[in-house]
């Protein structure tokens, strides 16, 4: 997907066309727009939810390349495994997120704590706070402002979110 976006951008395809086309392509847990289900109950109609299991530098760069085509403010809910180099991973998103809310991946021993992720995000000058779970994280972000809420950092994390949805 990321390579396809890169090629489209290199071919000077308008970002508006890319933005309209990508939601029609489906890879579970990869740039997955949530249009129905329990998650939608937590947000307003003018808020979009994207799930992406990006957890490596390469997948982070690919996600960044897509997110930078979005014109709305983007907020992040971030859960990640300790062995995936979270500090390096987050560097891929400079200037993208208006705010990051960190969460621990449920039932994962190797998950970073909310405090560990908050410290990483704060050191990279992000507005950040913690939440006990992704539902509380959504509550800390949702408002009347149109926006995109991007869940990212781990396929385990995205899987747990999808299970709840």
Roles of regions detected by a PLM:
Residues 1-99:
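Nucleotide phosphate-binding/pyrophosphate-handling subdomain across enzymes
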Residues 9, 44-51, 90-148:
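C-terminal helical cap/extension that packs against the catalytic core
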Residues 62-64, 89-91, 113-115, 162-165:
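Short amphipathic alpha-helical segments
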Residues 82-84, 106-109, 157:
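Short Gly/Pro-enriched loop/turn and capping motifs at secondary-structure junctions
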Residues 122, 158, 164:
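H/E-rich (His + Asp/Glu) clusters that bind or coordinate divalent metals
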Residues 137, 157-159:
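Short, active-site-adjacent cap segments at secondary-structure transitions
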Residues 154:
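Active-site-proximal loop/hinge segments that shape catalytic or ion-binding/gating pockets
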